[in-house]
Amino acid sequence: MMKEVRIDVTKQTSEELELAALHARLIHQFNQSAPFSDDWWRLQKEIFKGKIGENSRVMSPLTAVRPHEVTIGNNVVVMNGCLMMSAGTITIDDDARIAANVQLISNNHDPYHREVITCKPVHICKGAWVGAGSSVLPGVTVGRYAIVGAGSVVTKDVPDYAVAVGNPAKVIKWLDKTKFEDK
């Protein structure tokens, strides 16, 4: 079972608050920069503390909380309008695709103590594709080369090579794994 981390947001240190303010400023600058400009590339690396792989890009606008908890592999594309709530960490492996307006949410509020956030990692595995407008919730892994259909709400793990759709997302078919070559 995945360990849950709990954070009381009323007890943030001054350093944590300063880091949050820095991230907000960097993301604002990123969202105002011309895509693919030198500033845009520099800010992208700075936002993710260099944990973004070769030939990867995150398109603006981006909304992110604790982006230093996000790791992005090589050859990843994250399209416009992505929300990354990453207190529980978000990992996006090589060759993954995140379509427009996807929400990657690794934290939630405790239903009885709302000043406490509960955190579990989100993992998007190699070659996975998360369709437009989908939400991936805390503790979920989207498997290798899996597809999440547009508008889905993913509350449980999606197995490797599965196609899952709906709210909540359910597996509707399987991809032929022999059609995928690891690069």
Language-model features: where?
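Glycine-rich, flexible loop/turn motifs
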Residues: 26, 110, 118, 154, ...
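Short, glycine/charged-enriched secondary-structure capping and boundary segments
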Residues: 112-113, 119, 162-163, 177-180
